[in-house]
Amino acid sequence: MEGLYKEAVTFADRYNLLNVYGISAVIAVGLAIYSASLAIYRLYFHPLAGFPGPRIAAATRWYEFYYDVIKRGQYVYKIEEMHQKYGPIIRINPHEIVINDPDFYNSVYVAGNTRRTAIWPRYRTGIGFDGSHTMTENHELHRRRRKPLEPFFSRMGIDKMEPMIIEEAKLLNDRLTGLKGSGNVIRLDHVFSAFAGDVIGRICSESPPDMMNHPEFGKEWSAQFDREYRETAPFVHARPATGLVSSLSQSTSACPNRDRLARMIPTGFLLRVYPGAAGFNVFRQLAISHIVDAKKDNFSKEKVEKNSKSSVFRYIITSEMPASECETERLSREAMVLFGAGTATTARTMGFMCYYILTNPHMRERLADELRDVMADYPHKLPSWQELERLPYLQAMIKEGLRLSYGVMRRLPRISPDIPLVYKQWSIPAGTPVGMAAYSLHTDPEVYPEPFKFIPERWLGKYDSRMDRNWVPFSRGSRNCLGMK
């Protein structure tokens, strides 16, 4: 009897094992068939099937994933190689078209009154800034959210902010002067991150994070920005690139974003295990506290506009935006976008230019000569930004710095939701993400000879008008950078 029992148990174990193997095999075969079918559809029956480009890129997003995540942001250079092989229009993944033709730039990045324009939802997945104007997909909602911000960043708005910016610039000068002769090594990326962060902090919350008074200029902030840029690609590509898992993750939001994860972790614990997050956490709390206080103050629109130190969020709260658009959580995400974009890009460009000024004596001497008259009464009087705008060599240095430091190197996909885009003989279906990269336009050797060299003189005198055509550090159209002034 005991032997019969053992045989029965052995048979049952074998049956269960075979059953497990059988189920696994069925799942594996099913996934293989699904993936193969999806690849065949993308290669031969997809609306973009006829567009030039590598077949592997058309079949799967794993190709882009490899270059952007595994090889850490190299896809922008791989796309350049594709253009050399396949021409100005290419399909770089199953869903997206990239064009390298500066004459077509204004057809992709159009003004709001030309046609409706949306962003590609995948480009905001996982980043955690949903609800901000930058990450708003819908054309009309984006315009509503952006409209109250525009006067603040107009030329008139910048005039109002000028005294505050001068105040911060004087503080920066005082700090560096105080360190002169100390023998300390000062990292300019930390210095300019602190300066830009304090300026944008006052714009957003009327109270700066006070990084410039930090002994090391808040070096953890600069390090955090570097990490954020490096870590963005994995979260954008977090949803698997092909197959059944991709469909499931898109329908169930299986990959939570960083923002959601961070809000699930107690702040004290987060800062103990990840000190670099302190900078963003402090700014987020400053922004939330200020937004709550601004709502309580309930200032009139006239009072807000008269006060040169009013924050951008006082403008939003007193605008005609509905209450649903002025929720504290949404506005705090708007603050984080302004802080991130306003700090990182500004600091990088300033550091980039400063390096070339310090390492090229002839540039430094020429700039000093040009500044001598407008700085004659310093420190009692500083030149206005309108006076600085009239200095040709300074402006040439700024344009060259923006050309090579980049706001965003990679393409910024835009969608025409209603009508197809026509490029030469190609009709790009409505709803297709289409992008162009500043990197491609800014390094075109036919337009910018020796494109990777910092040559401010190329912008002086009578220069090739194509340089202005190709110069797009702030993008263009209805979704261009607010801070371009």
Swiss-Prot record:
Heme binds at residue 481. It is an enzyme of class 1 (oxidoreductase). This is Cytochrome P450 monooxygenase tndB. The chain crosses the membrane at residues 20-40. Its EC number is 1.-.-.-. Cytochrome P450 monooxygenase; part of the gene cluster that mediates the biosynthesis of talaronoid C, a fusicoccane diterpenoid with an unprecedented tricyclic 5/8/6 ring system. The first step in the pathway is performed by the fusicoccadiene synthase tndC that possesses both prenyl transferase and terpene cyclase activity, converting isopentenyl diphosphate and dimethylallyl diphosphate into geranylgeranyl diphosphate (GGDP) and further converting GGDP into talarodiene, a precursor for talaronoid C. Disruption phenotype: Leads to the accumulation of talarodiene.
